[in-house]
């Protein structure tokens, strides 16, 4: 039996490593670098009811230990994604987690109902926490009751388990998680932190949207803390993300209570990073003296007792 396999609602993962939505396009582009069947899963780019052209450029700015982006959920629309992008991925033996976004509740429900019927989509990721769009997006992710109600409506039409992506831009993430957990099958966390970078010469924001989402190694301590707090409060499957660059980062997240881990910004720096992390994990398990990665699950909570 594999030392890395993980079972979650709707997801039978060969290993706990997957690319995060928005950092891997629709996946097929990366197949030139390695066999995508080696991944635990693929979180594809967000799908909306209609095609979105995204925000004005520039949309990306490098920061110390990370980057700020304001792409604006650019995508060709849910039906194009189902008919073209998802079909390209059918050749790979890997479960797909489809990211669902929208401007109003009805958009989320529409996208979820349609994309959850695709044969290789095994779970949905409900994107209620994107800080880069002027309507929808994060507005659903900062009010516990609104988030819970949206989750309930999406869950009612989805043919696969529903995971909800939590925003770190809230006062109390545990309160959000508890409200959503009433209807969700799992959580993904965290989305980007709202950030700003300005040009030192002119004082103008570098990104046309003014603000954007901060990601990369800079946010890992925040994400670790939030995963730790949510896991301490409730028992629900968690796919963690935020600054993952190597196998030790994966171990850190599993230690605080994540079941699996998604790699985001690092894919832009190194398209091989997910495969390298997967290959590195058994060696790290040997060094830690454990047979299966699940033995490390939640160990931080155990040593704190």
Curated annotation (Swiss-Prot):
How many cofactor units bind, and how? Answer: Binds 1 FMN per subunit.
Q: What is its EC number?
A: 1.3.1.14
Give cofactor(s), names only. FMN
Record's function text: Catalyzes the conversion of dihydroorotate to orotate with NAD(+) as electron acceptor.
Q: How does it assemble?
A: Heterotetramer of 2 PyrK and 2 PyrD type B subunits.
What catalytic activity is recorded?
A: (S)-dihydroorotate + NAD(+) = orotate + NADH + H(+)
Locate the residues binding FMN: 21, 45-46, 99, 127, 165, 190, 216, 242-243, 264-265
Q: What family does this belong to?
A: Belongs to the dihydroorotate dehydrogenase family. Type 1 subfamily.
Q: What is this protein called?
A: Dihydroorotate dehydrogenase B (NAD(+)), catalytic subunit
Binding of substrate, residues = 45, 69-73, 127, 191-192
């Amino acid at each position: 039996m594999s030392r890395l396999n993980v079972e979650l609602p709707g997801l039978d993962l060969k290993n706990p490593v997957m690319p995060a939505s928005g950092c891997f396009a629709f996946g097929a582009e990366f197949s030139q670098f390695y066999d995508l069947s080696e991944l635990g899963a693929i979180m594809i780019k967000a799908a909306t009811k209609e095609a979105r052209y995204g925000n004005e450029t520039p949309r990306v700015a490098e920061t110390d230990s990370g980057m700020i982006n304001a792409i604006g959920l650019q995508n060709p629309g849910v039906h194009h994604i189902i008919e073209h992008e998802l079909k390209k991925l059918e050749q790979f033996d890997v479960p797909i987690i489809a990211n669902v976004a929208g401007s109003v509740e009805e958009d989320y429900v529409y996208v979820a109902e349609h994309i959850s019927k695709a044969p290789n989509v095994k779970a949905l990721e409900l994107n209620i926490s994107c800080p880069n769009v002027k309507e929808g997006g994060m507005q659903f992710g900062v009010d516990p009751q609104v988030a819970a109600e949206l989750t309930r409506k999406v869950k009612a039409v989805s043919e696969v388990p529903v995971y909800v992506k939590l925003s770190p831009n809230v006062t109390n993430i545990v309160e959000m998680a508890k409200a959503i957990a009433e209807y969700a099958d799992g959580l993904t966390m965290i989305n980007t932190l709202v950030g700003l970078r300005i040009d030192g010469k002119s004082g103008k924001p570098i990104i046309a949207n003014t603000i954007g989402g901060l990601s990369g190694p800079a946010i890992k301590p925040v994400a670790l803390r939030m995963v730790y707090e949510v896991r301490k409060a409730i028992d629900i499957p968690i796919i963690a993300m935020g600054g993952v660059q190597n196998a030790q980062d994966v171990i850190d997240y599993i230690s605080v209570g994540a079941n699996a881990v998604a790699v985001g910004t690092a894919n832009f720096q190194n398209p091989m990073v997910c495969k390298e992390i997967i290959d590195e994990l058994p060696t790290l398990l040997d060094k830690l003296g454990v047979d299966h990665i699940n033995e490390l699950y939640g160990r931080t909570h155990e040593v704190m007792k």
